[in-house]
Amino acid sequence: MEPSRQAIVHENFALVFFRQSILKRNDELFGSEIYAKATKQEAPLNKGYQQLHSDHPLATYYEVLTRIQLSALSQIEAAPSHSAPAPNKLFVTMNQSALLDKALIKEMNDAQAVLKKHEQQLIPSINSSSFLSFNLKEKRTIINHIHLLKDNGIEIAFDGFDLSDDSTEKLISLALFDYIKVDLTKSNFDIMVENSQDFFNRSYDCLSGMIHDSKIKFVADRVEHKALHTLARSMPFDFFQGRYYSPTELI
């Protein structure tokens, strides 16, 4: 291989797209979470890989939104006319700081307009970095942008809620969120419950209280094994996600 060509190959970065199913309590498919990771790619691109051309910090999110639309449309086109509709809840993981970008907000609204025509629902899943780290102007911008998304029919999820700490301070406002994803591995939930029945009771009361005070739906996230599955089913969760139910797949 010529040196110049070899350098180009080594400098290639590609996005790897992943999808994992989210189930209802009755084990029916509710939706899926889709995300991407950038990786240095030194071989020809295979399924699930896409060359990343831009060094823009939010380029990954733009590519994920494009992939979601293409994936949703291809599933609909491939499905027989008499088959049940594909799960219409499409969660996209992103940082809170991404909500500061007006262009990305427009891109999400445009994506939702396309998906809505095919009965699909975009759900940005905002990670649990503390809202307290933003200044007042940034907080107002994030809140305004969330309202813009919700005005266009986009539901919002909070990703990474930890039952072992006061994660509610990171939520900005309960009224802004439609879903809260509870990470059951963050606090070693099964070990904490085994060591303290009081921790289980407090966790149960915490979720029950938030459900009573709002219309939020809760997702038990990262249910990786049977012990966590058993505990999750004994809590007031609406939906379930993790390797116990389905592997993460390349798309």
Q: Where is each model-derived feature located?
A:
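Bacterial c-di-GMP phosphodiesterase EAL domain
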Residues: 2-115
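Distinct, well-ordered alpha-helical segments
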Residues: 77-80, 100-113, 134-142, 164-176, ...
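Surface-exposed amphipathic alpha-helices with a cationic face
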Residues: 112, 142-153, 204-215
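Short, well-ordered coil/turn segments that N-cap beta-strands
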Residues: 85-90, 117-122, 152-155, 176-178, ...
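EAL-family c-di-GMP phosphodiesterase catalytic domain
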Residues: 1-30, 36-43, 129-133, 161-163, ...
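Active-site mouth loops of central-metabolism enzymes
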Residues: 97, 157-160
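EAL-type cyclic di-GMP phosphodiesterase domain
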Residues: 39-67, 96-103, 115-148, 186-204
